[in-house]
């Protein structure tokens, strides 16, 4: 009888080829996380919550012409954090990756953000720091990465306690593998 078990690292990187990179800035108390692999891949999305902030997630619908993506970004910074995917796109374009339009390749990097603007970090910057955070996260992709207060989880909170970045994997036999990565920044009281 086949049974469920966690992957060797209990991480999304237990899924063949997937890599994750984190970058954060302790001064602004925010960061970005990138999920990618060496080749494009398929993805899907479910958008929930009262005020979701996303970019390029519409392309993940099965009726769209873009079948594969090149990366996914999770970032803090509310709407400012969506710029982290621009930094990742710069890196991918430098590797000649992306959706081939016939003229140029356009890296497809859906992203989602969390609200960490009231966590006590410095937010009076004049130049949006998230493009650079996205680039730095991409340059650090690996099959081994930090969870907790790293990357998109750096400034995440759950009301009065710390939120953060988490990951898991589950295998059903040798053929079915599921991985997840999440930046938890919920509202309400944990008590």
Locations of the language-model features?
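Alpha/propeptide regions of enzymes that mature by internal proteolysis
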Residues: 1-191
């Amino acid at each position: 009888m086949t049974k469920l078990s966690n992957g060797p690292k209990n991480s999304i990187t237990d899924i063949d080829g997937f890599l994750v990179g984190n970058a954060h800035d302790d001064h602004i108390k925010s960061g970005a996380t990138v999920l990618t692999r060496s080749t494009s891949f398929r993805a899907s999305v479910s958008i929930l919550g009262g005020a979701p902030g996303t970019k390029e997630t519409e392309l993940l619908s099965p009726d769209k012409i873009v079948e594969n993506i090149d990366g996914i970004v999770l970032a803090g910074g509310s709407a400012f954090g969506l710029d982290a995917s621009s930094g990742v796109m710069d890196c991918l374009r430098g590797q000649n990756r992306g959706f081939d339009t016939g003229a140029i390749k356009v890296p497809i990097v859906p992203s989602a953000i969390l609200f960490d603007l009231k966590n006590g970090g410095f937010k009076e910057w004049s130049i949006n720091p998230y493009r650079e955070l996205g680039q730095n996260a991409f340059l650090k992709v690996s099959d081994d990465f930090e969870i907790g207060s790293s990357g998109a989880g750096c400034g995440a909170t759950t009301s009065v306690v710390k939120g953060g970045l988490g990951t898991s994997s589950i295998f059903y036999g040798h053929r079915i593998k599921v991985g997840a990565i999440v930046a938890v920044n919920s509202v309400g009281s944990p008590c």
